[in-house]
């Protein structure tokens, strides 16, 4: 589990797996790698 802090993908406090940002189990947008 890695917390991603990105403003480009609106990913704040989300769970990131393999560089992919997930929101409540759903695929949001690619954030940090």
UniProtKB/Swiss-Prot annotation:
Any GO BP: killing of cells of another organism
| Keyword Disulfide bond listed | yes
Q: Which InterPro entries match?
A: Alpha-defensin_C (IPR006081)
Note the superkingdom of the native organism: Eukaryota
- Is Disulfide bond set as a keyword in this record? yes
Q: What coarse category fits the chief subcellular location reported for this protein?
A: secreted
Q: Which GO terms describe its cellular component?
A: extracellular region
Which keywords does the record carry? Answer: Antibiotic, Antimicrobial, Defensin, Disulfide bond, Fungicide, Secreted
Q: Which pairs are disulfide-linked?
A: 4-32, 6-21, 11-31
Q: Give the UniProt family note.
A: Belongs to the alpha-defensin family.
What biological function has been recorded for the protein in this entry?
Has antibacterial activity against the Gram-negative bacterium E.coli and the Gram-positive bacteria L.monocytogenes and S.aureus. Has antifungal activity against C.albicans.
Q: What is this protein called?
A: Defensin-1
Q: Taxonomically, what lineage is the organism? A: Eukaryota, Metazoa, Chordata, Craniata, Vertebrata
């Amino acid at each position: 589990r890695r917390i991603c802090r990105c403003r480009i993908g609106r990913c704040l406090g989300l769970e990131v797996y393999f560089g992919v940002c997930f929101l409540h189990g759903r695929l949001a947008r690619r954030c940090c790698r």
